[in-house]
Amino acid sequence: MAVTIDVGDPFDLHPVDKYDVGHRLALAARKLAYGEKIVGMGPLYKKMSVKGNKIILEFTNQGKKLVMGTSPYIPAGKPPHPKPTKLTGFGIAGADRKFVWADAVIEGNKVIVSSSEVAVPLAVRYGFSNSPRCNLYNEKGLPASPFRTDSW
């Protein structure tokens, strides 16, 4: 699997940036098919725990660390993407099952998610919107896969 959520056009099914798609597929093949000891894909959700009004997320395939990143794809004639200052793409919900956009921070190899609108959080979703703006990556520049912690 290769995550391409960050290399496409939100109004087109097929990403214009074929290079990064191919590069990511090749990394996955090198790891999975050929057994190379490399980071072959982006962070994958592993588990969550609740601590007070926060949800703590853990991941596999994170490499040495999780980082905020930007899309490698820059449309012709556009300036480079600015360096992100805030982790985006996370929604959080409580018992009412209503998701709101959340604050998220990277702490070591975990992501801490919270919102002042959700006192007792139960679930997190990442990348759950049309044309989501997601910026969680590993240090190799590979994006995290969208995920959900609920089954609602």
Where are these regions (language model features)?
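Catalytic cores of secreted or luminal carbohydrate-active enzymes
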Residues: M1-T88
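C-terminal beta-sandwich/jelly-roll accessory domains of carbohydrate-active enzymes
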Residues: G63-W152
